[in-house]
Amino acid sequence: MKTDVAQAKRQIRAEKIAWRDAQPAAERQEKSLAVWKRFFEIPEVGQARTIMLYHSIGSEVSTRTAIQQVLSTGKRLALPRVDSAAKVIHAHEVNDLSQLERSSFGILEPSSTAPILDPGEIDAV
């Protein structure tokens, strides 16, 4: 039974990713900008001192504009980094996109030398 559910979930996920990948790049960019416009209009986000995001990959909603906006406003930016050995994810403070490096999964994440933030320091995710 669990195998059937897992297989169905994999199939649905693959179909949705294929659909998303098929969308024109200009349309994906337009929709990404609309998402972040609404995000930054949320009062709690405006008041936040530290915001946690992730670096998007492929055809996901692009987070690059949001990351740059957080950095340009002087707020603290937290991005996740996977510690595979410890099987944990830590939030690291990033001050510049040059602090990112490719993980073994091909995802851009903070370098291991970027400071780890306490989860209590993060005001908005």
Go through each PLM region and give its residues.
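N-terminal active-site beta-alpha-beta segment that forms phosphate/nucleotide-binding
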Residues: 2-123
